Regions:
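Residues that act as N-cap/strand-start positions at coil-to-secondary-structure junctions
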Residues: 19, 76, 161, 223, ...
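Beta-propeller and closely related beta-sheet repeat lectin domains
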Residues: 21-24, 78-81, 163-166, 225-228, ...
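A generic secondary-structure signal
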Residues: 42, 166, 273, 444-447
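Acidic-residue sensor for enzyme active/binding pockets
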Residues: 79, 181, 440
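Short glycine-aromatic motifs
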Residues: 162, 214, 224, 269, ...
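Short amphipathic alpha-helical surface patches that serve as generic macromolecular interface elements
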Residues: 223-226, 245, 268-271, 438, ...
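Structural preference for beta-rich elements and adjacent junctions enriched in aromatics
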Residues: 309-492
Length: 492
C-alpha cells in the first residue's frame, strides 16, 4: 500500500513533482488510524512554501481503506510526530523551517545562498483531525513554536536549531517531555546533539521567531541525531538516537536522567524509531545503509529490547498444576534470552505461606539440557551466602534445589517445594519443531530469609544445541554470582 503517492504538479507554469517523506502514524482514542507525512515540491522546495507542508490521511477500518488526503499545514518542515493527550487533543510536532526561509524566498535569494533555520513547532486538533489550530496556509507559515535554541548568526539572520522532535506525555503527570536533535557548525562540519525539553502547561505560550526556549530544558547532552522517546507503563523512559549506530539509553520516570547507551544492532545507518509492543518490550528500528557490488541497497534493522526492573510480587491464589490461567493478574516478569534461540519469562506471585514462580520458556528444539536457573537471595546480601537458593527447572519440571554452602551450591531436600509442568514438544527429537515448556514452582517462605520485605533474584537460561554446545543467557550485564547485582523483588 502506497499511502502517500508522489505525483506530478505544476509550479509557476512548469512541471514539478510532489514528494512525501517522514510519515508518522498513531491509533487515535476513537480507533481511527491517523497518518501524517511531510510533503514538498521536488524542484521548488526553496522557491515557494506554497507546495511544502503536512498531509494527513485517516483510516476508520484498521488500515484497510483510507480517506482522502488533507493538507493540514503549509510551510517548509520535516519529520512530523503525532501525540494524543488523554483529553483527546492531538498534537503534531515537526521541524519548523518555514518562517525563517519565507522572507528569503520572497527576496528571490538563490537556494545556494539561503540561510536555513529550524526549531520545533506544533499544531493541534481537538476534533480528531477535522480542524487544526493554528491553521497555517499562508505566509509567514508560522505554527506554535515550542522549542528552539540559538546556534549562530549568518548574513544577519539568527539561526536556530532543535529539530526531529519526538514527544510523550509522562505517565501520571501533566508533563510533556520532548526529545530533539540540535545541530551546530563546528570547523565547517555539522555537529549533532540530543536535547530534551519539558512543559507542565501544554506549551501554553509559544516562542517568538527569535526567542530561545523553553526554560525547562536539557541542551546538547550527547552527540547524536534523530531521537525517539518512549515510556514503559512501569515508569522507565527509553531514549534512542543515531550516532552512525543505533543507541538506546534507559531513563528515569521524568525523562531527565539517563544511563549509559547500549547498542542493540550491529549495522550502521541513519534515522531510527522506538515503539512499545508489550508492557516490557520496546522495538527499535533503523535504516541499515549498505552497498552491495557498489549499489546502494538499504534495509531496515529491527531489535526487540526487553525491560527488566524491580518487581512487586502480587498477591494471588495459585494452584500449582502446570496451567498459567491463575496468573492473569500477575504480569510483571523478568525476561532472558538473546544469545540463544530460546527465551524465558519468569513471573512471581505470593501468598502468606509461599512465593510462586511461573517459568515460561520458548524453545524450538528441546533437550534435557535446556534449563532455567532461578536464584533467590536475601536483599541484605551483596554476595553469595547460606541464604542464597538456586532452583533449576527444565522440560522435565523441577530438577534441582540447592543452597550455597560457602563454596558451592549443595542440593537440599526439595520436599517442601511444589512444582508442576506442561511440555509443548518432544525432548531430544530433532525432526520436529517444539514450542517450549511451562513450569510452576511454589517455594515455602520458611526456606528463605527476607529482609526489609525484599529479595534479590536472578535468572539464567541454558540452551543445549544440536551439536551439544551449551549457550548461557543472562540478564544484561548482571553477574550470576553477585546478588548485589540482581533485581529487587518485593514480597511483603
Amino acid at each position: 500500500l502506497k499511502l502517500f503517492n508522489a505525483h506530478n504538479i505544476t509550479v509557476f507554469d512548469s512541471s514539478d513533482k510532489m514528494c512525501y517523506s517522514s510519515c508518522d502514524a498513531t491509533v487515535l482514542q476513537n480507533g481511527d488510524i491517523m497518518a501524517i507525512a511531510s510533503f514538498r515540491s521536488g524542484r521548488n522546495f526553496r522557491v515557494t512554501n506554497e507546495f511544502n507542508g503536512l498531509a494527513m490521511k485517516i483510516s476508520s477500518d484498521g488500515g484497510r481503506t483510507w480517506g482522502v488526503e488533507q493538507i493540514i499545514y503549509k510551510g517548509s518542515n520535516w519529520e512530523p510526530q503525532i501525540l494524543q493527550l488523554p483529553d483527546g487533543e492531538i498534537q503534531v510536532y515537526f521541524t519548523h523551517g518555514g518562517p525563517k526561509i519565507q522572507p528569503q524566498m520572497e527576496a528571490g535569494i538563490p537556494e545556494s545562498e539561503m540561510v536555513p533555520s529550524s526549531g520545533t513547532a506544533i499544531i493541534r486538533s481537538k476534533d480528531n483531525g477535522k480542524t487544526w489550530d493554528p491553521y497555517v496556509m499562508e505566509p509567514p507559515y508560522a505554527a506554535h513554536r515550542v522549542s528552539q535554541q540559538y546556534a549562530y548568526t549568518k548574513k544577519g539572520i539568527q539561526v536556530f536549531t532543535d529539530q526531529m522532535p519526538c514527544a510523550i506525555l509522562l505517565n501520571n503527570t501533566d508533563t510533556i517531555a520532548l526529545a530533539m536533535e540540535s545541530m551546530f557548525v563546528r570547523d565547517g562540519e555539522d555537529v549533532l546533539y540530543i536535547t530534551t525539553a519539558y512543559s507542565d502547561d501544554n506549551w501554553a505560550v509559544g516562542l517568538g521567531i527569535d526567542e530561545e526556549g523553553p526554560a525547562d530544558k536539557q541542551e546538547n547532552m550527547w552527540h547524536g541525531a534523530a531521537p525517539y522517546l518512549r515510556q514503559f507503563p512501569s515508569g522507565e523512559t527509553v531514549l534512542s538516537y543515531n550516532q552512525k549506530r543505533f543507541q538506546i539509553r534507559l531513563g528515569d520516570s521524568l525523562a531527565r536522567e539517563f544511563g549509559d547507551p547500549i547498542d542493540p544492532m550491529h549495522g550502521t545507518g541513519f534515522w531510527g524509531s522506538l515503539e512499545l509492543i508489550q508492557s516490557h518490550i520496546v522495538v527499535g528500528t533503523m535504516t541499515y545503509a549498505r552497498k552491495v557490488s557498489g549499489q546502494q541497497q538499504n534495509r531496515i534493522m529491527i531489535s526487540q529490547n526487553v525491560l527488566n526492573h524491580r518487581i512487586d510480587a502480587p498477591r494471588a491464589r495459585i494452584r500449582v498444576d502446570g496451567d498459567n490461567t491463575d496468573w492473569d493478574d500477575a504480569t510483571d516478569a523478568l525476561f532472558v534470552g538473546s544469545d540463544s534461540q530460546a527465551q524465558a519469562a519468569v513471573r512471581p506471585a505470593k501468598d502468606d505461606d509461599n512465593l510462586y514462580f511461573l517459568v515460561e520458556r520458548l524453545d524450538t528444539d528441546l533437550s534435557d539440557g535446556d534449563t532455567v536457573e532461578l536464584y533467590l537471595a536475601d536483599s541484605g546480601s551483596d554476595t553469595l551466602d547460606t541464604n542464597t537458593l538456586r532452583l533449576t527447572v527444565g522440560p522435565n519440571g523441577l530438577t534441582g534445589a540447592a543452597r550455597f554452602n560457602g563454596s558451592d551450591f549443595a542440593e537440599i531436600d526439595a520436599g517442601g517445594i511444589q512444582a508442576a509442568m506442561t511440555l509443548q514438544g518432544t525432548i531430544g527429537n530433532d525432526e520436529d519443531e517444539d514450542t517450549g515448556y511451562l513450569v510452576e514452582v511454589a517455594v515455602p517462605r520458611s526456606l528463605l530469609r527476607i529482609s526489609n520485605q525484599q529479595l534479590r533474584w536472578n535468572v539464567l537460561l541454558r540452551d543445549r544445541g544440536t551439536d551439544g554446545r551449551v549457550t548461557e543467557d543472562i540478564l544484561g550485564t548482571i553477574r550470576w554470582n553477585v546478588p548485589g547485582d540482581w533485581m529487587p523483588l518485593t514480597v511483603d
